[in-house]
């Protein structure tokens, strides 16, 4: 910048040598041309820095986008794969989550290999939670084709309300698989040419001998379950529903997976607090729910539960045919006098009170009915319609009339 001096401004004789020699140095600097501006250079460097930063952000964003969308190069195996491996798909998982699981298990070379291949197969979005037999070192396309194949899913089975541990032979000689038999079948898978099946006998042995707490039985059920006949300790403690177990597990591991999942379901149905204010323990409510499940169709659950409460309150024997049938190899719609006369813990014609364990797997509706029965004075009921509807009575005479009606309707 130019330096100004008042004395210098008054002397205009710029060519006087004498005067020039006496001019202070600071004044001579005033004649020099102004230095070049530096602010422009600073601005240029700032702009260059900003461009570099933006470029780095763009490159990083593009790389991340490639990772998410599968654009660009990625590792991929060739072919259908080699050895078998079981992987688990959990509820709520996305395609990316499944891809990560497959990569961790060595099924695909990279998650992106599966994600890219899945884009051309809409069935991937329908993959359900559970266990799947996959091939290691498979191409992304082969892995997608494998996981959407229904034959690849293993270890899944369904338990219906009213199911029992042991299988039942119906009057027409058809066999209804019990929970133990279903678990045995669910344990089966073919892994590298070897079967993972666990025989029903091994599973039954675990029911009789395993530590119930280690199997996952809820604390509120353990004392009563341990008092039961060994083969019936888990009766009623497997809630109805769809279950997934991992083939290749031991007999005890299979039961632990099943019982633990069931305990979670029972808790979701508000057990054991559901039994509060009933006058009965949670296990007793579970027993009553199993009777309701076996004795009635859904619309009559509340009334049958009330009959149970009323008869127990009045000291009457329950006299439920379902408890007689429970211990028979071949249950019948109408039990015989001989069967009703047999001595046994589950004979509610000969014994007062509830049977020692549940006789089936009660569903949520039966549990709620057992905890909160309908209001009424009924003491008797009989199935009086072919659809399973029951007729209820408060007196023995009314009950006899209902039985005659049932016969006339061909209900039994």
Describe these PLM feature segments.
Residues 188-191, 203-412:
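Bacterial extracytoplasmic/cell-wall-associated proteins, especially those involved in peptidoglycan
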Residues 45-51, 92-96, 339-344:
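A broad, low-specificity signal for short, low-complexity segments enriched in glycine/proline
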């Amino acid at each position: 910048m130019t330096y100004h001096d008042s004395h210098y401004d008054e002397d205009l004789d710029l060519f006087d040598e004498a005067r020039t020699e006496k001019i202070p140095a600071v004044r001579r600097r005033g004649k020099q041309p102004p230095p070049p501006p530096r602010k422009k250079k600073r601005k240029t460097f700032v702009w260059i820095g900003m461009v570099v930063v933006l470029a780095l952000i763009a490159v990083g964003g593009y790389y991340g986008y490639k990772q998410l969308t599968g654009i660009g190069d990625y590792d991929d195996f060739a072919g259908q794969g080699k050895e078998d491996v079981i992987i688990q798909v959990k509820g709520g998982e996305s395609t990316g989550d499944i891809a990560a699981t497959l990569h961790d298990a060595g099924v695909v070379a990279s998650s992106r290999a599966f994600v890219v291949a899945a884009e051309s197969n809409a069935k991937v979005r329908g993959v359900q939670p559970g266990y799947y037999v996959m091939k290691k070192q498979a191409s992304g396309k082969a892995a997608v084709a494998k996981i959407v194949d229904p034959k690849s899913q293993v270890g899944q089975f369904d338990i219906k309300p009213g199911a029992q541990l042991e299988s039942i032979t119906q009057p027409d000689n058809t066999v209804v698989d019990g929970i133990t038999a279903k678990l045995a079948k669910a344990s089966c898978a073919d892994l590298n040419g070897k079967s993972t099946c666990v025989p029903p006998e091994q599973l039954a042995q675990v029911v009789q001998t395993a530590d119930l707490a280690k199997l996952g039985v809820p604390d509120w059920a353990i004392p009563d379950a341990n008092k039961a006949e060994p083969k019936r300790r888990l009766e009623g403690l497997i809630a109805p529903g769809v279950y997934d177990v991992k083939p290749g597990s031991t007999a005890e591991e299979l039961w632990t997976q099943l019982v633990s999942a069931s305990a979670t379901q029972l808790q979701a149905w508000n057990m054991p607090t559901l039994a509060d204010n009933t006058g009965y323990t949670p296990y007793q409510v579970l027993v009553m729910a199993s009777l309701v499940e076996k004795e009635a169709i859904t619309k009559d659950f509340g009334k049958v539960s009330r009959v149970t409460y009323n008869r127990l309150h009045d000291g009457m024997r329950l006299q439920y045919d379902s408890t007689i049938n429970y211990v028979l190899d071949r249950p019948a719609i109408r039990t015989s006098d001989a069967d009703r006369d047999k001595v046994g813990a589950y004979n509610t014609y000969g014994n007062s009170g509830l049977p020692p364990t549940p006789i089936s797997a009660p569903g949520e509706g039966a549990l709620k009915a057992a905890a909160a029965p309908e209001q009424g004075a009924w003491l008797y009921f009989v199935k009086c319609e072919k659809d399973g509807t029951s007729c209820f009575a408060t007196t023995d005479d009314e009950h006899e009339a209902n039985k005659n009606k049932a016969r006339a309707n061909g209900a039994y």
